[in-house]
Amino acid sequence: MKSEYFNHERQVLIYTPGGYQQFDQTYYDVIYVFDAQCREMFDLVHCLLNMACKPDPDGGRSTSFIIVGICSPNLWDINYFRNHDYLPMPLHGNNGLFKEGYYYGKSPDLKKFVKNELMPYVKTHYRTSGRSLGIGHSLSASFVLDAMITDDLFDDYIAISPNCYYDEYRLATDIENHQFKNRKAPRFIYASMSGEIDDGPDYWGDEWKAGWERVSKFLKDKSHFSENTVTSVQTFPGYGHYNGFMPSLTAALNDYIVFGAKNLVSYVGEETYPVHIELRGKNLTDPIYITGNQDALGNWEAKGVKMTLTSDSVASIDLRLHLPAQFKFTRGSWEREAIISNADAGNHIIHNAEHANRVYRLWERNHWMGE
């Protein structure tokens, strides 16, 4: 992609989940993966979601996401390198990663690129829900945490083996001083470290360990966060800085699915919006119900709210709903839940008022479970 913030094009990778073309009524959360120039890190995210994550046992939370990889280049011809992307300008002098001739100072521009150019591009070219997760490793994990503090860039954050001590523990200090309780909506924050903090061949030094200890101690203290924020802090002793990425990412993504199932399914905003929902199929007969995550949808009672049969092929309903609205269709019991052909498994979700008119289609071979 061309960018007004850089003198070079930004390489971006985009993965869409299986069924994306078929499931035209599903709008997907987006995961932004940094350091995607290491292709294995980008590929691990969608592979682990499909192969190593336990699905929500209640069937409400899908493991399908759009994955966007942001590559950080090494461009010798213009003297631009990975560390430029992930480090700000120093506040405490030119030492450590900020020595004269080192590479730093463009992290504010990378944030602007993501917020002002990449996210709008993804939104206009793909069916997105509006919810986002940022994933980083090592210095890109530091960038992800810094973006949480300075720009509130994503909704959720996974930081694996972050450098928390650069620029005289700047990131650790910023996290300790940030007012996390100001955010009331659900949020997931995961941070981990491998053998970098343990005595042995993988030890990365006392400063690295001290920075991590400050950040991990803060994140573990629930009193710093609102009740809708879930933090998970883990360590993986015996793994090195690089081979610890996979076990940590596996744990993080599984925690994230659990967070979604427990915290996102029940959450709704304060405002209500007009919504029109149709269910289409052949030879429809009464009764057909819609049920979901709020009073106007019957609060997940199997006989939630009866839909109007406008013909033998269309049932519809008009409601004012809090968003995100999550719902399913039944014939009056959970044993007779609708089988939908044009939406992903899990709850059907209306995330925002831009996509408040929905048309769902029953599977032609079998409309309902148990029939």
Positions of predicted regions on the chain:
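Non-catalytic cap/lid and distal C-terminal segments of serine-dependent acyl enzymes
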Residues: 1-270, 291, 295, 310-315, ...
